[in-house]
Amino acid sequence: MILDSLKNASASFSLNPRFKKAFDYIKNNDLAKMEPGKIVLDGDNLFISLVEIDGKKPEVAKMEAHKKYIDIQIVLVGQEMMGWSAIENCKREIAPYNAENDIIFYTDKPTSYITVNPGEFAIFFTEDGHAPAISNGRIKKAIVKVLI
């Protein structure tokens, strides 16, 4: 898991060849002013889901993980807390892995929390369980899906 500011995004380019294209798009477009929806940058290899959601309380946020995609979660409006736990600590599955949606949910609780503000991002790799959307208010965010 990585937490950083968008102004430092170039430091992550070496981690995946698709990161540069994603962050270049984000830098050159005002995502906060766009309507929610899907932005395809490179087919199923790289796309952005723009969402507006009501925040959840920490006790109801579910841990999730992915096997095929890295998540880059960028807060556009509001403030979001995200839970984190190493995937090996996520043992209690709610349901089997959903390959079509590349997601599995767990009842396990995060071992750590981070706060992400507008202009900041969190990268969750396949070894990172995460509980997103923890907030007292409404959040607008971009979820960049990067095929590994």
Language-model-detected regions and their locations in the chain:
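A short, N-terminal "cap"/entry segment at the start of jelly-roll beta-barrel domains
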Residues: 2-49, 60-65
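A short beta-loop-beta micro-motif enriched in histidine and acidic residues
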Residues: 60-71, 89-93, 109-110
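Conserved metal-binding segment of the jelly-roll/cupin
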Residues: 114-129
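A short hydrophobic beta-strand segment most commonly corresponding to one strand
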Residues: 121-123, 138-148
